[in-house]
């Protein structure tokens, strides 16, 4: 039911920007927004107070075609636009949402003494286009206080993910940490007394597993899309996938919405990427393992028949398919449904508890994935059961 609700929900008019039901005065459209734009005579920075701390939670609308709003954990919310990935729905709600987003963002920047021109170009353009609500600006200002986060925010991919989830780096560390431990334990179980004699192969296998784990967290993570529109000459397929979310189940920001087809497109696009990642990482890891096995057999004739080489191509393609289907769906559900839609709204003010639950969920997902891989590999015949 929770997954189904990510695709189908009844839109409701968005009449409030917070639980205090503040009414925003209508502000004339800005011909060109910048830090020097004057708000005198229209609205003052003190007319609406942002001194109250805004909870850093996903904002938004979970519509799949029409405008609508989801109030997740008290964050700023708003109706989605139309079903064309950021377009309005034709009844004026999309334009109102973007005007409100623009006004919120500009007021917060003015109160913080930050000029629009000093922001990353993609973020500044998104603010001017009204695609960034005030809660995202609040999160941006919070992240800027950390030197590490400020450095990571220089990179577009990390910037989009950190603005959507301030615990993204913690989840990435959890996943890679669990991956290192479980993969090393599996290597030791398989090699036993030869573990330290085969450290080169162990290192290669673990490194490939970490790369795969990184991409499994990075690609399906919910994002705040800062991508500029494609050129008018771009093909229809390119435009379609460009407008798809990074996570099929992610909550849409105020002023944006995704159709059911676009959400399905997110699964397809990420599946293609994970197939390439899984196949490549398995090719490298399997090739290194086989090379070491053959070298050991050439030196030690007594080792003949002890360890069989692994079929490179079939194993790599099988692993790519496994990541594109099983891993893709599991990690999309973990990030978009369990974490963003269920855990964050309940625990957005209790970061430690939220992190602990995310760790438990991701550890369980990793264990489940290991079991599914063994069953799948035996089913298609690339591994034998003894």
From Swiss-Prot:
Query: Where does the UniProt annotation locate this protein?
Result: Plastid, Chloroplast membrane
Q: Which residues cross the membrane?
A: 201-221, 273-293
Query: Gene Ontology terms, cellular component aspect?
Result: chloroplast; chloroplast envelope; chloroplast inner membrane; plastid
Transit peptide limits: 1-61
Q: Where is the composition biased (Basic and acidic residues)?
A: 86-99
Tell me the segments the record calls region Disordered: 61-99
Spell out the Pfam families in the cross-references.
RETICULATA-like (PF11891)
Query: What follows loss of this gene?
Result: Pale interveinal phenotype due to marked reduction in the density of mesophyll cells in interveinal regions of leaves.
Keywords from the UniProt entry: Chloroplast, Developmental protein, Membrane, Plastid, Transit peptide, Transmembrane, Transmembrane helix
Where composition is biased (Gly residues), the residues are 65-85
Matching InterPro entries: RETICULATA-related
Major subcellular site: plastid
Membrane topology according to the record: Multi-pass membrane protein
Q: What does this protein do?
A: May play a role in leaf development.
Q: Which family does it belong to?
A: Belongs to the RETICULATA family.
PANTHER family given for it? PROTEIN RETICULATA-RELATED 2, CHLOROPLASTIC-RELATED (PTHR31620), PROTEIN RETICULATA-RELATED 4, CHLOROPLASTIC (PTHR31620:SF14)
* Protein name as it appears in the record: Protein RETICULATA-RELATED 4, chloroplastic
The organism encoding this protein is Arabidopsis thaliana
Q: Which gene encodes it?
A: RER4
């Amino acid at each position: 039911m929770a997954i189904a609700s990510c695709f189908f929900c009844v839109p409701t008019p968005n009449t409030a920007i917070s639980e205090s039901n503040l009414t925003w005065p209508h502000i004339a459209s800005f011909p060109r927004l910048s830090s020097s734009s004057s708000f005198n005579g229209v609205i003052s920075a003190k007319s609406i107070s942002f001194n109250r701390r805004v909870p850093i939670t996903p904002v938004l609308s979970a519509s799949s075609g029409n405008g609508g709003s989801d109030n997740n954990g008290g964050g700023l919310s708003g109706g989605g636009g139309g079903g064309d990935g950021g377009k309005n729905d034709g009844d004026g709600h999309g334009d109102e949402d973007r005007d409100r987003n623009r006004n919120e963002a500009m007021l917060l920047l003015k109160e913080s003494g930050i000029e629009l021109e000093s922001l990353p170009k993609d973020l500044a353009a998104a603010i001017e286009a009204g695609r960034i609500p005030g809660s995202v600006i609040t999160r941006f200002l919070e992240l800027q206080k950390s030197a590490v986060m400020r450095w990571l925010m220089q990179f577009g991919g990390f910037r989009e993910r950190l603005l959507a989830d301030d615990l993204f780096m913690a989840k990435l560390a959890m996943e890679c940490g669990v991956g290192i431990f479980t993969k090393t334990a599996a290597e030791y179980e398989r090699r036993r007394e030869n573990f330290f004699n085969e450290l080169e192969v162990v290192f290669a296998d673990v490194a490939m597993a970490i790369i795969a784990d990184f991409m499994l967290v990075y690609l399906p993570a919910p994002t705040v899309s800062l991508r500029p529109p494609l050129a008018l000459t771009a093909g229809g397929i390119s435009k379609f996938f460009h407008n798809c979310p990074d996570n099929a189940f992610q909550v849409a920001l105020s002023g944006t919405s995704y159709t059911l087809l676009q959400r399905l497109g997110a699964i397809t696009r990420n599946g293609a990427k994970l197939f390439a990642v899984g196949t490549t990482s398995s090719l490298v890891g399997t090739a290194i393992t086989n090379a070491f096995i053959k070298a050991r057999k050439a030196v030690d004739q007594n080792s003949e028949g002890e360890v069989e080489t692994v079929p490179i191509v079939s194993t790599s393609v099988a692993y790519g398919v496994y990541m594109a289907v099983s891993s893709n769906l599991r990690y999309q559900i973990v990030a978009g449904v369990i974490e963003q839609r269920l855990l964050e709204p309940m625990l957005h003010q209790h970061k430690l508890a939220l992190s602990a639950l995310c760790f438990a969920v991701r550890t369980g997902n990793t264990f489940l994935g290991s079991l599914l891989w063994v069953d799948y590999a035996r089913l298609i015949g690339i591994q034998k059961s003894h």
